[in-house]
């Protein structure tokens, strides 16, 4: 059975749709707030963290992943104040029961957050973003090992690069190696092959 990770927006009708399809969902992902470093351009009507937390709390239990998947950040993001503000935001989502992990693209930011607040890090899993292009066992192993070297929980699943969709023998071999190394970690594929 296929399971999907889908974006979340705090719309009551959409929340009801997701709740009704919860058995087919691997989780939801969302922008943590208008000032957080994710790979999307800011929208004009980004929901507030309070709106997001309220909407997420109405969903059945499933992974709820906040996006921190920008590869490049403003210098202020990694400053003491920037890390503090980001950790306060993560802690607020945790207190609301609205966050189970983060999708990240910068190992340095992940390590900085882990070092700045081991308490927050231990509550969240760290999921490598798709821009890591996990197209080989060696690359995937290096990225997962790096995530596991922090205080964050290991990723419950990783999304393999879309290029492996075109090589079923290679995909089978890569998946076998990953499952032997991390038997509890799920594997996913990009679905937008066009």
Positions of predicted regions on the chain:
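Active-site pocket-lining/capping segments in soluble small-molecule metabolic enzymes
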Residues: 1-143, 149, 153-194
């Amino acid at each position: 059975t296929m399971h999907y990770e889908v974006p979340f927006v705090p719309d009551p009708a959409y929340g009801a749709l997701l709740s009704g399809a919860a058995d087919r969902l691997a989780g939801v992902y969302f922008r943590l707030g208008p000032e957080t470093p994710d790979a999307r351009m800011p929208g004009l009507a980004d929901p507030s963290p309070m709106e997001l937390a309220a909407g997420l709390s109405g969903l059945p239990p499933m992974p709820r992943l906040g996006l921190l998947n920008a590869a490049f950040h403003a210098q202020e993001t990694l400053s003491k104040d920037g890390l503090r503000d980001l950790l306060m935001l993560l802690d607020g989502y945790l207190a609301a029961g609205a966050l189970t992990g983060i999708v990240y693209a910068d190992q340095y930011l992940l390590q900085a957050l882990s070092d700045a607040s081991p308490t927050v890090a231990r509550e969240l899993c760290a999921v490598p973003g798709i821009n890591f292009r996990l197209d080989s066992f060696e690359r995937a192993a290096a990225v997962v090992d790096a995530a596991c070297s922090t205080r964050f929980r290991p990723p419950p699943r990783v999304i393999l690069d879309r290029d492996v969709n075109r090589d079923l023998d290679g995909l089978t071999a890569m998946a076998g190696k990953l499952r032997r190394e991390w038997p509890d970690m799920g594997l996913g594929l990009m679905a937008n092959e066009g």
